[in-house]
Every structure is written in C-alpha cells, then in structure tokens.
Amino acid sequence: MALNPTLTSWRGQRVWLIGASSGIGLACAQALHQAGASVCVSARKAAALDGFVAQHPGARALALDVTDADSVAQAASAAWGEQGLDWVVYCAGHYQAHEATAFDLPDMLRHQDVNYTGALRVLDVLLPRLLAQGHGHVSLVSSVAGYRGLPKSLAYGPTKAALTHLAEALYFDLHPAGLGVSVVNPGFVQTPLTAQNDFHMPALMQPADAAQCMLLGWQRGDFEIHFPKRFTRWM
C-alpha cells in the first residue's frame, strides 16, 4: 500500500533539489528535467549549477549554503516564487571517513550542520508555506549508514540516522495535512563523496541508476526508498 500519493507524470511538477551540483542530487535533477519536471537546483557551487542550467533549458539555479540560515531563507523564497513548489528534495551531504581513535570534533559538527541541521533550516522556511498550500512532498536523502553503526562512519552515520528519524516523525505530522514525506536510503553510489573510500563498496551503483530508483519510488508513493535491494535488504 502506498503511504504517499502516487504520481503518473512528472510533467509540470515544480521540484527544488538542494545539494544538486554533483552525485545523486545532480543525477536526480537530470532525470527529473528529462521527465518534464520544472527543476530548480541549489548548492554552494554556483559554477556547477550554472553549467546544469546551460545544458537543461528551463531549469533554474539558486546558489546557497545550507549551514547559513539567511542563505537558505533567501534561496527558499526565490525557489517558491509565485507558484509554490510540489517537491522539496534535500540531497545536501558532507562525508569524511572517521574513527574514534582520531576524533575530530569540528568535522563531526560539520557533518551535523550539513547533513541534519541544514535540512531543519530548509524545513523551517518551507513547512509553513507547504502547509498553507495544502499539498507538496518533502523527501530527505539519508543513507543505509544510518541503519546501524558501521566502520569509519562515526561522523556520517549518526547524522543519517537522525535524518531518517526526522522523516518518520514528519510523516506522522504532515500526512494528515495532505503533504507527502519520504526518505531515501541509498547503499553505495559512485559519487565524489564515496570516491575517497579506501575499502570495497559492495553493490556499487551509478548515480543515474540511483536517480531512476528514486523517481520510481516517488511515483509509487513509497515512504522509504532504498537501493540496491540486494544490498539494502541485507542491511
């Protein structure tokens, strides 16, 4: 049974993706644009965003820093515009392999600020507008690293566990108000973040394949979207 409204076509859907300059976020933006959605992309790297817009007619770019509340508020207002938004997808992420034997508090807090608190800043601005609008969908891109403690995931894993927990709580509060909520828990995907890993990454996926899994899950009305199944079911 679908926990969110299903979707038959992306054509005309207004989607704002935060963290879309590379990796999964960029691949999702590309797939959504190809499917006919009206796409707005945001990240810190303005040049990468401008490159996306140049290659995808009709797309918009809004540079922001998710660790800066004013930056988020300005970009959110611009993304909302006069027509509102149908989808808000939080893909922003920071990752460095960490072990407790080399504890690094500043970078631990950087993980928290980007991966979790950044999502809160976006929600703080947009939830009142989405509730007033009476429809819309919030999707948080988490990770299977949030399922349980894993090696070298001392900083990253807990922030993703928090993001998944946040999505679950949001669903209970927002579903009765007519809003959709989903959480995406990818396994290993070939991105600039995972490129630093010096260990074997089982069932490694390409970003374009991950994006297709996400679009299909959103269309089906899934709450949790996890992939690849041969890996995530084991987790």
Feature-to-residue mapping (PLM):
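Conserved glycine-rich Rossmann-like NAD(P)H-binding loop of the short-chain dehydrogenase/reductase
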Residues: 37-51
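Active-site helix of classical SDR
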Residues: 123, 159
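C-terminal helical subdomain
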Residues: 183, 199-234
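Rossmann-fold cofactor-recognition segment
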Residues: 56-70
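Conserved glycine-rich cofactor-binding loop
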Residues: 21-22
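Substrate-binding pocket helix/loop in short-chain dehydrogenase/reductase
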Residues: 99-112
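Residue(s) in the substrate-gating loop at a strand-loop-helix junction
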Residues: 143
